[in-house]
Amino acid sequence: MIRILLAEDDDAMRTYLARALENAGYEVVAVDRGTAAVPFLEEQHFDLLLSDIVMPEMDGIELAQICADIAPRTKVMFITGFAAVSMKASREAPGTKVLSKPFHLKDLVMEVERIFDDQWTARI
């Protein structure tokens, strides 16, 4: 089963995202900030880090950089409601996917599926 670490500081958004991903068959561990995600990255395996960019204590870009050091095989996908932040993420964390808010939950699930479809296709 594909494991996803979700870092999102908004309680309602975190709940909705986790539920949508779990309903799609993914195992989700959800935390409310980047600093809370780091110990999970250090201690467990995740296939995907799904992170908001703008969060207290540690933003999603910094979290993605730490993830690249700790767990380089973990894919990274950002979610954000700020276009300028999205552009910064694309510059500072190349190769990551950025999904801009607002989005439908089905769009999130489709993007996650696409990440792993591409991964499996590349192995064949």
What are these regions (language model features)?
Residues D10-V29, T96:
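Two-component/phosphorelay signaling modules centered on CheY-like receiver
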Residues A12, A20, H104-M110:
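Conserved two-component signaling phosphotransfer/partner-docking surface
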Residues A18, A30-L48, D69:
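Acidic, metal-coordinating helix/loop segments flanking the phosphotransfer/catalytic sites
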Residues R33, D59-L63:
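Acidic catalytic/metal-coordinating carboxylates
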Residues D52:
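Active-site residues of response regulator receiver
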Residues M55:
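Receiver (REC) domain active-site loop signature in two-component systems and cognate sites
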Residues E62, F82-S100, K106-M110, R114:
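Alpha4 helix (beta4-alpha4-beta5 surface) of REC/receiver domains from two-component response regulators
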